[in-house]
Amino acid sequence: MTLPRRALLTGLPFLAALALPEPAHATPRGPAVSRASSRPYVSGRGGYAAYRIPALVRTRRGTVLAFAEGRRDGVGDSGDIDVVLRRSTDGGRTWGPLAVVAAGNGNTRGNPAPVLDPRSGDIVLVTCGNAGDVTEAQIMRGEVTAARGRRVYVQRSTDDGRTFTRPRDITDAVKRPGWRWYATGPGHAVALTRGPRSAAGGAPGRLLVPANHSTAPARGSKDTGREARYYAGHALYSDDGGTTWHLGYQATGPAGTVNVNETSATQLPDGRVYFSARDQNGGAPGNRLDSYSSDGGATLDRPYAPQPTLKDVPVVQGSVLQLQGDGAPLLFSGPSVPTARRAMALWSSTDAGRTFTRLATLSDGPAAYSDLVQLGPGTVGVLYETGPYDALEFRRVTGIGGHPPA
């Protein structure tokens, strides 16, 4: 069925954030972190009290799309929340007007997970939502009907992110009966470009969205379902460019030792998918978990396990991105103080995620959620929450993997 198209709603006009004039700064052993930054989203502007939950994708034409949740009532996770977008045609230096991609209309819409479909060139966007007057805690306790609880939606853009189709509900295909909470990403999804599960005949194709959910306690349990051990990970995928969707791997729970929460994914050069997840107060050391899939996200090669070399990361969402190019590293972004959300940093892995090394620190102040996008050889853009959720800041990092700083 062809969905009707609608023009994106533009928010209140405000000036595109301009890059600061200072030159890039390179450490003797690290990449160049540009002192110039832009802020596509500043809380209190554009009709929203706060912006959170960044997600990035680069279109086939090179346009950077920066998605976020526009929260009208404050920084909280429930209430009147829209999925919003700003576009940049100059690598994140300046940004076009704010647009609403998925309007909450008093309800909650969020957890953007965008991806470039390599076959069509379209941008496919998966999001979640629920009634605006319910909370995550109520949903996890089973106090909310399915209609008012977490739902899953897909949209697409065929015009470089200028307009998107209306959200189409795919919940029945990707959410099992009995699951309560449900969240995609947040952050970019993955288009598989190599390996037997890339698509029929080995062509690029499978769209893979990392996600998490919560389950209900066993009958007779004194638990409410709000306990962190009821979180678990899963993935959803499409092999036809986002038309039909299926459930991939589904991690079992409750465990209590590792509690898989917000998850990011990327495809490694050998074709495997690498998953990196937030450990929501599990009993294992550290706050990051990881796993691998050799069949395009349908199953996991092993259960999630702690990632000890990311021990400085607090309990928070993080982003992973395998850079393209011979010998290019796998990157991870997140705060770098284990007991606080501050000091956004980049880590690098040259052994497919077995170990990570701190690559660069982007800022010393408060920082939380982030997402990564490759802008060119050895160059990435990082969109991250900064301040006490004051803004989403975009920074360019160049000179990664031996490339000269730009």
Where in the sequence are the language-model features?
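C-terminal region of N-terminal signal peptides and the immediate post-cleavage residues
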Residues: 18-32
